[in-house]
Amino acid sequence: IVASGGDDGVLRRVVRFFEQEGFRVIGPGEAAPELVVREGAAGAARASDEDRADIQTGLALIRALGPYDIGQGVVIAGGRIEAIEGVEGTDRMIARAGEARRAAHDAPRGGILVKRSKPEQDLRVDMPAIGPATVEGAHAAGLSGIAAEAEHVLIAERAVTLARADAAGIFVEGVRDEAPASATPRRFKAHRVVRDLRPLGGVKPRRHSVRDAVKGLATIEALARFGVGHTAVVVRNHVLAVEADEGAEATVRRAEGLRQWASLTRRRRGVVVLRRAEALTEVLVTIVARAGYAGIAIGDDAAAASGDALAAAEREGLFIVTSPSASSEGTG
């Protein structure tokens, strides 16, 4: 179960096991409804009109990522996506955004954490939550508010959380996705997708790497309209990290410490996916090889790929594949 993919797949199997044994599984929202975020402002501060536009963008981005079982949170400011949550969790994502802001000379002021459930997420066993640590992290990162999907997110230690938010001048608000239900894409199943992957060089991907590449390519394509997602890292059908704007090298380094426990073997596993061939450099190849990944997939043709980088990949035993065409779903 653990090796089969993301959290959603694992948890659905766990729930199914207990239900088959005659148990009724209930969620925290049913057991403690007073902890559930309701629509509207929960504290004293209020979101601005600009904040509301960012909130809808953040909700849409997480919705777009839902089929790939990644991301319950994003940090966004003035329409710019600053961080996308991977398997590291919300608090570490906020801290990462804060570090990037402090390092930048033109860092934006304000900004929002948008937190929502993924489409088809089973809220009985995996309900997103915010709490005091979320508020503290948002304040340290210079954010102005937290927008949480109404009826789908919990507030842990509600009184403490809201008191700290009020003291910091941070709004906490329950919001709804304005998009119709028909806008929610269905779950992505890499094994049912047919995609032309063209190897460059003598190293060929194994079947599990092909599936990782297919899922990663679909993930970055889903984010193209948001201007982010130039790099993704996928291991055993699990998307570990997606780039906002930190660059391919930083994204791969970040993902290196986020591997699933089922992937901690000496065998090379996982694929780094790049939207553009220009991102393929000798330095990146070295980072990918040292991190123990099996290869690199590129979402356009190989014309812009560095010959030196391709030669380095061959020396390191990494496969390189390109896939400039869109995928299609098969019937298998």
Name each region found by the language model:
Residues 4, 18, 48, 117, ...:
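Generic serine detector
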Residues 51-62, 166-187, 209-216, 317-332:
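Short, basic, helix/turn surface patches
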Residues 1-32, 181-183:
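N-terminal glycine-rich phosphate/adenylate-binding segment common to multiple enzyme folds
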Residues 15-22, 62-66, 101, 142, ...:
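Structural signal for hydrophobic packing residues in well-ordered secondary-structure cores
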Residues 4-8, 28-135, 187, 191-205, ...:
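Conserved mixed alpha/beta catalytic, RNA-binding, or beta-rich assembly cores of soluble enzyme
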Residues 11-12, 132, 159, 282, ...:
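Residue-level marker for well-ordered alpha-helical positions
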Residues 15-18, 87, 116, 121-124, ...:
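Noncatalytic linker/hinge segments flanking ATPase motor cores
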Residues 136-175, 179, 286-329:
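C-terminal binding/interaction regions
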